[in-house]
C-alpha cells in the first residue's frame, strides 16, 4: 500500500550520482550559505534573481516579497542541511516507484529539463511536462500554465485509479 497516490516534482532531481560532484556541490552550498549570512537576505535575493533563469520574477511578485522576509540564518541553515550535495542519489530506486509521477520543468532551465526527461523515462508511470518560456521557478514564473499541467496530471491520475 502506498502512502501517496501520485507525485509532482517541480524542477526536482533524484540526486547527484558522482560522489566528487556531490562533495563539490556541498562545498559550494556551504560557501553560498556563508555569503547569505554575510550580505543579508535582500542583497542575496536580488543577486539570485538577476540570473537569467529567474528573469521573469520581480519585486512585485508576492513570493519574492515573502522571500525577502526570511532570516539569513534560516536560509543559510536550510541550504547547508538540504544541499543536494548532502543527499544520497535515488536514481536506482525510481524504477520501483509504483505511483504516477509528473516531472515538470521550465523550458529555459536546460539542466532540469534533462533531469525531468530522465525521471519521466525511468519511473514506470512517469509523465513529462515542460513549461515554455519559463526558467527554474515554474510556479512563480508561469503559475497558470504550471497549475494547468498539474491539474491535468492529477485528473488523469485520479481517473486511472478508478
What is each PLM-predicted segment?
Residues 120-137:
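Catalytic histidine neighborhood in serine/cysteine hydrolases
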Residues 134-143, 147:
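Catalytic histidine-centered segment of alpha/beta-hydrolase-like enzymes
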Residues 3-36:
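Flexible "cap/lid" loop of the alpha/beta hydrolase fold
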Residues 97, 103-105:
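Short beta-strand/loop motif that positions the catalytic acidic residue
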Residues 63-92:
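Hydrophobic, aromatic-rich cap/lid helix
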Amino acid at each position: 500500500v502506498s502512502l501517496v497516490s501520485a507525485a509532482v516534482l517541480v524542477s526536482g532531481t533524484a540526486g547527484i550520482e558522482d560522489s566528487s560532484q556531490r562533495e563539490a556541490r556541498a562545498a559550494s552550498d556551504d560557501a553560498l550559505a556563508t555569503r547569505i549570512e554575510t550580505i543579508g537576505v535582500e542583497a542575496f535575493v536580488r543577486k539570485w534573481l538577476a540570473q537569467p533563469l529567474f528573469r521573469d520574477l520581480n519585486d512585485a511578485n508576492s513570493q519574492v516579497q515573502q522571500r525577502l522576509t526570511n532570516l539569513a540564518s534560516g536560509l543559510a541553515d536550510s541550504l547547508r542541511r538540504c544541499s543536494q550535495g548532502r543527499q544520497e542519489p535515488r536514481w536506482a530506486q525510481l524504477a520501483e516507484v509504483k505511483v504516477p509521477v509528473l516531472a515538470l520543468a521550465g523550458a529555459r532551465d536546460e539542466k532540469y529539463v534533462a533531469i525531468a526527461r530522465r525521471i519521466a523515462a525511468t519511473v514506470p508511470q512517469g509523465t513529462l511536462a515542460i513549461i515554455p518560456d519559463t526558467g527554474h521557478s515554474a510556479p512563480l514564473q508561469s503559475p497558470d500554465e504550471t497549475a494547468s499541467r498539474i491539474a491535468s496530471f492529477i485528473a488523469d491520475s485520479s481517473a486511472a485509479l478508478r
